[in-house]
Amino acid sequence: MANSKSALKRIRTSERNRLRNKSYKSAVRTLMKKYLQAVEEYAASPTPENKAVVDQRMSAAYSKIDKAVKRSVLHRNNGARKKARLAKALQQVASAS
């Protein structure tokens, strides 16, 4: 256990930041899963409604990833890699149909 006041404060601060970062990462993962699920549905039946859902979910996922990068929860290369994977998933579906 920490002995000094400053070390105790660092423990509290790092725990607070860890929980905040955890919630951001969880939200990013959730939105990515929802987007990939929408892409699968669009691949199964490419209707304009499904395309609109895909576009909406992509926008939400990109936004959350960018905010996580801005707040240094994710490294910018990690954020770029996640966005590239999302774009690639849609590109593969579009080229297949």
Curated annotation (Swiss-Prot):
SUPFAM superfamilies: Ribosomal protein S20. Pfam families: Ribosomal_S20p. GO terms for biological process: translation. GO terms for molecular function: small ribosomal subunit rRNA binding; structural constituent of ribosome. It comes from the Bacteria. Residues 1-22 are annotated as: Disordered. GO terms for cellular component: cytosol; small ribosomal subunit. Keywords: Ribonucleoprotein, Ribosomal protein, RNA-binding, rRNA-binding. Binds directly to 16S ribosomal RNA. Belongs to the bacterial ribosomal protein bS20 family. This is Small ribosomal subunit protein bS20. It comes from Crocosphaera subtropica (strain ATCC 51142 / BH68).
